[in-house]
UniProtKB/Swiss-Prot annotation:
Effect noted on mutating Q351A: Reduces binding of cAAG about 2.4-fold, significantly reduced protection against phage T2. Complete loss of cAAG binding
Complexes and interactors: A monomer in the absence of ligand, in its presence it forms oligomers.
UniProt comment concerning the protein's domains: The cyclic nucleotide ligand binds in the C-terminal SAVED domain. DNA binding requires the extreme N-terminus.
Gene Ontology MF terms: DNA binding; endonuclease activity; metal ion binding; nucleotide binding
Keyword set, alphabetical order: Antiviral defense, DNA-binding, Endonuclease, Hydrolase, Magnesium, Metal-binding, Nuclease, Nucleotide-binding
Catalytic residues as annotated in Swiss-Prot or TrEMBL: D49, Q72, K74
InterPro entries: SAVED (IPR040836)
Region (C-terminal SAVED domain): 258-464
The name this protein goes by in its record: CD-NTase-associated protein 4
NCBIfam families hit by this protein: SAVED
Cofactor note: Probably binds 2 Mg(2+), only 1 is seen in the crystal structure.
Taxonomic lineage: Bacteria, Pseudomonadati, Pseudomonadota, Gammaproteobacteria, Enterobacterales
Length: 499
């Protein structure tokens, strides 16, 4: 099969999977404000791949409520593609010949309701050092109008962006350009095609529909193609339920009723809003720049109280929680401490990974061997470090940091899965629980002095971090650490919470 044909198929399948994820909200009782989802229906050109409508309008990260989300979905087979601010005036960037994405945005803003949001969703990434990357919000992908319209002249770095876009759109003033760009979101580096398959499966599992886990052909891709051939593009809540019944997708047993709760210090893009209702979501995105807190924001003084207050409220009102943890490992551990064994809350975790999302619970069956645990003496201090090498070997970097910065640490307890570290080394929720319990037992046996601290360096799925956090009430004073993957600081570890 020609590569171009295969790429075209993959592009349609990617778009279809995005549609199914959005459509699953029509059967989610916690998202009853979602009233219609359409797929390549009549809508503003270039923003009609998927359209989601709300009544009442959904909340946004700003003061306005959103009546509809319009999506342009752009997929590439490889991750080699990248783009910058100049590409937004090139019709070829969206596979068109005449109109650019910005021209289509301007047209759409003139025909659609004022409180609409328009999204460019792409697997491509923004070119390093391109000015576009400096004006995209890490919170919701919107254009940071305060950053773009910064009072500089057209000869400045941001001014060149404004001038190019303004002239391309035949606008006279920056004020007119600002009106066009308001409500425009760019979501780069979106999940892979395979990860989107797992997201569909997870969304369908939550609402009580069958999934497609093992077949090489993903049945819902074919179902989307069939809908297009039948010219069935729009679905209300009633119509989507009827489709599920027609296709025999509804499971015989009703799904358990868990309250969706989301903690977020990283973003997956526009799909984030599906995780949980705003009142059950704590977004910490505005407190971070990359992997580390923004200037003036401290882990213990600012971030920790927000997490604790939010989860205390959840613990007081909910008994069954499905927890979405798109967070730093330290926040996942703190969440486990807040929702510990004595909280009385039954927890189901949505584990995020490179291959998509999956639901993990501590009640799953597992027969994995115990983790391999080795203890190394590195000094005479009374503190102990636990290094979790679950997804990668964290020991060399952790040991180097400890020897240079933490003379009070005398022993390192190193934990690796019996089958070796890697992205798939933890099989499910019960396996994660078993690892956390084993680590807790070893630390208890280490007999730390009362005045000593336990230092935790984790390269592990957040499920392991969460379950280990549930044990920290019994482990004395604990210090969590974050690794500088992006070399924002020194490419090593830095302490985060002390609990």
């Amino acid at each position: 099969m020609a590569t171009s044909v295969l790429a075209n198929w993959h592009g349609h399948d990617y778009q279809a999977r995005y549609f199914w994820i959005e459509a699953s909200r029509l059967k989610n009782p916690q998202q009853d404000f979602v009233v219609e989802v359409s797929y390549e229906a009549d809508g503003p050109k270039a923003f009609d791949d998927v359209i989601t409508r709300y009544n009442p309008p959904r909340r946004s990260t700003g003061p306005d409520r959103i009546q509809a989300d319009y999506y342009q979905i752009k997929f590439h087979v490889t991750q080699a593609a990248s783009f910058g601010f100049e590409d937004l005036i090139d019709p070829a960037f969206i596979g068109a010949e005449t109109f650019s994405i910005l021209e289509r945005l301007k047209q759409a803003k003139g025909t659609e309701p004022a409180n609409s949001a328009f999204h460019l969703v792409t697997t491509d990434r923004i070119i390093d050092e391109d000015p576009l990357g400096e004006i995209i919000s890490n919170v919701d992908g919107s254009i940071r109008l305060d950053k773009l319209f910064d009072g500089t002249t057209d000869r400045s770095r941001k001014g060149k962006v404004r001038k190019l876009w303004r002239q391309h759109l035949k606008l006279s003033t920056d004020q007119e350009l600002e009106q066009v760009l308001s409500g425009f979101h760019i979501q780069q580096s979106q999940p892979t095609l395979e990860a989107m398959r797992e997201k569909v499966n997870t969304c369908f599992q939550i609402i009580g529909l069958i999934t497609c886990e093992t077949s090489s052909d993903f049945r819902f891709d074919g179902a989307a193609r069939a809908l297009r051939s039948q010219e069935r593009y729009r679905f209300t809540r009633e119509q989507f339920t009827a489709l599920c019944e027609e296709e025999n997708w509804i499971r015989s047993e009703a799904p358990e009723s868990f309250r969706n709760v989301a903690l977020r210090s990283f973003s997956d893009g526009p799909l984030d809003i599906m995780d949980a209702l705003p009142e059950h979501t704590l977004s910490l995105l505005s407190l971070f720049e990359g992997r580390f807190p923004s200037p003036g924001i401290e882990w213990n003084d600012v971030i920790k109280p927000q997490v604790e207050t939010f989860l205390t409220g959840i613990r007081q009102t909910e008994r069954k929680v499905r927890l979405y943890l798109n967070t730093h490992s330290s926040i996942a551990m703190l969440a486990g401490k807040c929702l510990g064994h004595k909280s009385g809350v039954e927890i189901e975790l949505v584990q995020k990974g490179r291959m998509g999302d999956s639901i993990w619970s501590e009640n799953e069956s597992q027969d994995e061997p115990d983790a391999v645990i080795e203890t190394e003496t590195v000094g005479t201090g009374s503190d102990v470090a636990v290094v979790l090498s679950i997804t990668r070997n964290a020991l060399p970097k952790a040991r180097a940091y400890i020897l240079e910065n933490q003379p009070d640490i005398g022993r390192i307890i190193h934990v690796t899965p019996a089958n070796g570290h890697g992205q798939r080394s933890v099989k499910n929720g019960s396996h994660a629980v078993a690892i956390a319990e084993q680590v807790s037992d070893v630390v208890m046996d280490a007999d730390l002095p009362v005045e000593a601290s336990l230092h935790i360096f984790s390269a592990a799925p957040n499920a392991v971090n969460f379950y280990l956090g549930q044990h920290t009430d019994f482990l004395g004073t604990c210090v969590f650490y974050e690794f500088d993957f992006q070399r924002q600081r020194d490419g090593s570890y830095l302490p985060s919470f002390k609990v």
